[in-house]
């Protein structure tokens, strides 16, 4: 089977094998990794280095003849004093050869194909604001990826000329290799390049025998190369590629004609991968836009009938609409928005209206002030018509967080002296989440705080809401029953609602699009930050108390369905990943 046929016959597997990244990237599908296409690119390069990508021509001069000429040229350069005689590299044993090569190919150590070295030391005091660019590993990685780099380190032309006397300055068709960080990343030196490089951080392959540099470059981007250099790279937690290790890496060396044919075929197939990748990304973007547009018809519905009609339209295509994690996340956000708009459950005219609830809350707070349990709050202005984003159902009211809160507070800066190996839980931003109010318990810290003062003020109780107020503002954590003694740090706000509001409507509101929009509004300082007064001023739709419970139950029911959908989707995605892996293994073996 040709590689072209391998691509076209299984295009559904290559394009549908997706993986969710842990961190968001650029664009609406920045969190999606096109795993299948990535595996296809790896496969193309792996087939190439094994000599299985293009058929061999028995009339081609074998690689052994080319290697003889290279050895003769090297001996002549030593004789002329242009290069130093190298210590012979170890013979290649049969046990070392990782796979069988086609007839006419040879295994060779990289050091036998050219000269591998590093630069002369450039001291920090020699760095200049302009002059000849001075590249470290990070600049080589950027050059390899984009073909250009915005560099901020330079050396003087005079120093550059003196450093070039050692014969290891970059020249056209030499190959730079990163020695630290992401090791082994190659960059072919172009005719217009003029730069120097950091010793040990970057290695240079001096192409003294005019080997086809594009062929070596393809090998240096293959999985085979990455596996080989990491197998014996120095360092435990940090890998490095040394000159001695690079010298000894085995290279599958093709005949000159095969090298040219392979590079051409790889470029041709990578272009197909580029097209497939662009089509997949465009399809994912179009799908997500369609989902978001249709879901917007639900929140934009003007009445119950229109909402029902729009839902019927979506439900008829449920199995084709909600097929990605992003689309399911959008559905979750729509459910939460419908909930706070009063469109998720029907209103009951027999419910006590929210206006009466607010009166009761006001009376309860007045009593707590009288008993000295809370301080009297400064009254905030009512929610203005300009702030109200939509019309509320009958029986609902607009209010601010401060109207239903006993108090808000944040932790202090000097809690480091209370840190301990065990004791009370210290809730930090690392325990909060963006779209969930369940506390994260995978990154726990402990404190032994004072009994009075800060210890009393920042001690958490069940149903307290903890909110991040610096950096990634608006991340949440709801304190559950049975958590035990716990406190907050200075980057979080403790929001304690009046006991009558201890239900799940309010945590659901705090993770809704309406709340997130308010968290994203104030931008203060170098990092986004939120003051306690900003939290108190958050405006929200307040349903009757009985309806709050019905809404929370319905949200929980629907979000459980969404979680089940996502779980099924992830299982299906895992199957597609296994199929892509199996297809790759089958093609290689």
Question: What do these predicted ranges mean?
Answer:
Residues 120-122, 141-155, 175-198, 212-218, ...:
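Short, ligand-facing micro-motifs at secondary-structure edges
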Residues 10, 17, 22-34, 41-43, ...:
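Non-catalytic DNA-recognition/assembly elements of restriction-modification systems
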Residues 91-96, 111-126, 140-172, 192, ...:
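Sequence-specific dsDNA recognition surfaces
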């Amino acid at each position: 089977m040709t590689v072209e046929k391998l691509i076209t016959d299984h295009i559904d597997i290559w394009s549908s094998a997706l993986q969710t990244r842990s961190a968001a990237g650029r664009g609406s599908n920045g969190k999606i990794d096109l795993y299948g296409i990535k595996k296809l690119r790896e496969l193309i390069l792996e087939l190439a280095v094994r000599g299985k990508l293009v058929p061999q021509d028995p009339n081609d001069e074998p690689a052994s003849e080319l290697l003889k000429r290279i050895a003769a040229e090297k001996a002549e350069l030593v004789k002329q004093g242009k290069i130093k005689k190298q210590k012979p590299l170890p013979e290649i044993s049969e046990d070392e050869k990782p796979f069988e090569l086609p007839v006419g190919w040879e295994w060779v150590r990289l050091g036998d194909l050219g000269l591998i070295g590093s630069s002369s030391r450039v001291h920090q005091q020699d760095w200049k604001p302009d002059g000849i660019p001075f590249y470290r590993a990070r600049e080589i990685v950027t050059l390899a990826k984009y073909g250009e780099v915005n560099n901020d380190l330079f050396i003087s032309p005079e120093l550059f000329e003196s450093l070039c006397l050692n014969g290891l300055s970059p020249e056209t068709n030499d190959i730079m290799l990163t020695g630290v960080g992401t090791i082994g990343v190659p960059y072919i030196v172009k005719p217009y390049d003029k730069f120097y490089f950091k010793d040990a951080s970057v290695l240079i392959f001096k192409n003294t025998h005019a080997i086809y540099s594009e062929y070596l470059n393809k090998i240096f981007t293959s999985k085979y190369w990455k596996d080989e250099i990491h197998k014996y790279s120095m360092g435990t937690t940090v890998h490095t590629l040394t000159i001695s290790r690079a010298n000894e890496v085995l290279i599958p060396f093709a005949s000159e004609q095969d090298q040219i044919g392979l590079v051409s075929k790889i470029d041709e197939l990578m272009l197909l991968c580029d097209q497939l990748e662009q089509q997949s990304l465009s399809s994912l973007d179009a799908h997500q836009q369609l989902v978001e547009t249709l879901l917007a018809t639900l929140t934009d519905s003007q009445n119950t009938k229109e909402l029902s009609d729009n839902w019927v339209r979506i439900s008829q295509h449920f199995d084709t609409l909600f097929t990605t994690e992003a689309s399911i996340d959008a559905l979750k956000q729509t459910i939460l928005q419908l909930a706070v708009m009063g469109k998720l459950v029907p209103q009951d005219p027999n419910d006590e209206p929210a206006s009466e609830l607010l009166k009761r809350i006001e009376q309860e707070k007045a009593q707590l002030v009288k008993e000295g349990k809370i301080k009297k709050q400064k009254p905030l202005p009512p929610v203005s018509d300009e702030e109200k984003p939509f019309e509320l159902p009958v029986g609902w009211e607009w209010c601010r967080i401060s109207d239903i809160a006993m108090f808000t507070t944040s932790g202090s800066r000097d809690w480091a002296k209370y840190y301990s190996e065990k004791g009370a839980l210290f809730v930090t931003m690392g325990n909060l989440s963006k779209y969930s109010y369940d506390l994260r318990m995978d990154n726990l810290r402990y404190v032994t705080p004072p009994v009075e003062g800060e210890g009393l003020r920042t001690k958490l109780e069940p149903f307290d809401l903890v909110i991040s107020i610096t950096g990634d503002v608006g991340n949440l954590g709801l304190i559950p029953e049975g958590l035990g003694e716990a406190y907050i740090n200075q980057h979080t706000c403790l929001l304690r609602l009046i006991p009558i509001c201890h239900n799940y409507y309010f945590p659901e509101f705090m993770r809704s699009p309406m709340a997130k929009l308010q968290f994203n509004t104030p931008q203060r300082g170098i990092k986004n930050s939120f003051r306690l007064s900003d939290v108190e001023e958050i405006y929200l739709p307040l349903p009757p108390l009985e309806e709050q419970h019905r809404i929370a139950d319905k949200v929980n029911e629907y979000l459980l369905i969404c979680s089940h959908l996502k779980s099924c989707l992830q299982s299906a995605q895992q199957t597609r990943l296994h199929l892509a892996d199996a297809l790759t293994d089958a093609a290689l073996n």
